[in-house]
From Swiss-Prot:
Biological processes annotated in GO: cell division; cell wall organization; peptidoglycan biosynthetic process; regulation of cell shape
Name under which the protein is recorded: UDP-N-acetylmuramoylalanine--D-glutamate ligase
Family according to the record: Belongs to the MurCDEF family.
Gene: murD
SUPFAM superfamilies: MurCD N-terminal domain, MurD-like peptide ligases, catalytic domain, MurD-like peptide ligases, peptide-binding domain
Top EC class of this enzyme: ligase
Keywords recorded for this protein, A-Z: ATP-binding, Cell cycle, Cell division, Cell shape, Cell wall biogenesis/degradation, Cytoplasm, Ligase, Nucleotide-binding, Peptidoglycan synthesis
Reaction equation(s) it catalyzes: UDP-N-acetyl-alpha-D-muramoyl-L-alanine + D-glutamate + ATP = UDP-N-acetyl-alpha-D-muramoyl-L-alanyl-D-glutamate + ADP + phosphate + H(+)
Main location group: cytoplasm
Length: 454
């Protein structure tokens, strides 16, 4: 779709929205930007060079104020807002910023989604893809807006995009050459309402694929596996727990590919730097994706040996006085935090809490009871988590009023040979702007406690 001189409304003036405006201006569109925040609460607006008539700020607008042919939504904006619904009724197209950036780009596109593991998988695929020698862009829901970067990528390049359910629910014509669905567990139910709606949003990563494209699915996740018969693309399965008849699996200590009755060994688990069974999901999906790029087994294995992981995902902060500190601030739901608990054999002091996303903590607390030595709760969800802990029979837990107090309590509970793990099972939005800010503050507090230079 040629956007030159088309009227396009961008909703949300955060990172994605500002990137979308810049991209649209480069494409010759007539842009209107709206955000309910006041101008002094927003940064980067002035640099866009939009006249006042193309800025609608400080309130949720009526459709007649912002009428457009295309609406581009930032990830945090619900398409159910009345003015957006009125626009849809009037025939406006609704896109995500990712759709805007990628829909007409000829590069090879790899999309990664799932409840947990997206960022690690996306980053790992990007690292491996660069071994092809082609220009590679890693972006999406991972800190870099695609619209900011895509014009710098040549037509023969590779795009690896982390895609959230918010971005995927707005798929219009976006087609991924390789689409990956890692797993689906309850998350963002405050936005999607039901698990079925959430799964449907995730599954849209495959909606526009063709028979020549590839869909990579987790065999061990029944909800994901059952999508296979409904997909147009060629399906490749992986299983982090078993040897499949066809697909990527495990045999003893090795990750292998089973195909046409032949077993191909790829790499031994002990050669990997990433800990935890859940990381096998990320690794296997990454292997399957980059095989579509033509990488050899040795090139893949060498890349896997060198990959150390991603900041804020079970990141090693350091060992102080015999205590290992792990920053898993990206563990923003119970399933992610539960996987982190199973990654360590040492006794764990867990810091959990933050802002809940409408999720239940009872099953999570059953795992906490089995795996955790001491539990420290903090944040707006602390009372809810405390009740779930009581209901599960956990008697020893601590409540902190501030995040700094939570870290000090955890250190006091820990002994040499223990792990202090920040894996909150909640978002950061009650105390911090992002999980990154929370993770950085955790690292700062730990280093400050042990008087290490920051």
């Amino acid at each position: 779709m040629n956007l030159k001189k088309k009227k396009v409304l961008v909703v949300g003036a955060g990172r994605s929205g500002l990137a979308a405006v810049k991209r649209l201006k480069a494409l010759g569109a007539r842009v209107i930007l709206t955000d309910q925040k006041e101008p002094d609460q927003l940064s980067g607006i002035l640099e866009l060079g939009l006249p006042d008539g193309q800025l609608v700020l400080g309130h949720i607008p009526q459709w007649h104020e912002v009428e457009a042919e295309v609406i581009v939504l930032s990830p945090g904006v619900s398409p159910q807002l009345p003015f957006i619904q009125e626009g849809i009724a009037q025939g406006a197209l609704v896109w995500s910023e990712v759709e805007l950036a990628l829909r007409d780009h000829p590069a090879f596109k790899i999309g990664v989604t799932g409840t947990n593991g997206k960022t690690t998988t996306t980053t790992l695929i990007g690292e491996l893809a660069r071994r092809t020698g082609k220009s590679t862009l890693v972006a999406g829901n991972i800190g870099v807006a695609l619209s900011d970067q895509v014009e710098n990528l040549d037509e023969e390049g590779i795009i690896v995009a982390e895609l959230s359910s918010f971005q995927l629910e707005l798929v219009d014509s976006l087609c991924m050459n390789v689409g990956i669905l890692l797993n689906v567990t309850p998350d963002h139910l405050d936005r999607h309402g039901t698990l079925e709606n959430y799964l449907a949003a995730k599954a849209r990563i495959f909606e526009k694929q063709r028979p020549s494209d590839c869909a990579i699915l987790n065999w061990d996740d029944a909800r994901v596996r059952e999508l296979a018969p409904h997909l147009k693309a060629r399906v490749v399965f992986f299983s982090p727990t078993s040897l499949l008849a066809e697909g990527y699996g495990v045999q003893g200590d090795e990750i292998v590919l089973a195909r046409d009755g032949k077993i191909t060994p790829i790499i031994k688990r002990r050669e990997l730097q990433l800990r935890g069974n859940h990381n096998l999901e990320n690794i296997m999906a990454s292997i399957a994706a980059v095989r579509e790029l033509g990488l050899s087994w040795e090139e893949i294995a060498q890349g896997l040996r060198e990959f150390k992981g991603v900041e804020h995902r079970q990141e090693v902060v350091g060992t102080y006085e015999g205590i290992l500190f792990i920053n898993d601030s990206k563990g923003t739901n119970p399933d992610a935090a539960e996987k982190a608990l199973y990654a360590f054999e040492e006794p764990i002091v867990l810091i959990a809490g933050g802002k809940n996303k409408g999720l239940d903590f009872h099953d999570f607390m059953k795992t906490v009871k089995e795996q955790v030595k001491s539990l420290v709760l903090v944040g707006s969800a602390a009372a809810e988590m405390e009740q779930a802990a009581k209901d599960t029979g956990i008697r020893h837990y601590l409540r902190a009023e501030t995040f700094a107090e939570a870290v000090e309590l955890a250190i006091a509970e820990a002994e040499p040979g223990n792990v202090v793990l920040l894996s909150p099972a909640c978002t950061s939005w009650d105390m911090f702007k992002s999980y990154e800010e929370r993770g950085e503050f955790f690292k700062e507090l730990v280093r400050r406690h042990y008087r290490e230079p920051i």
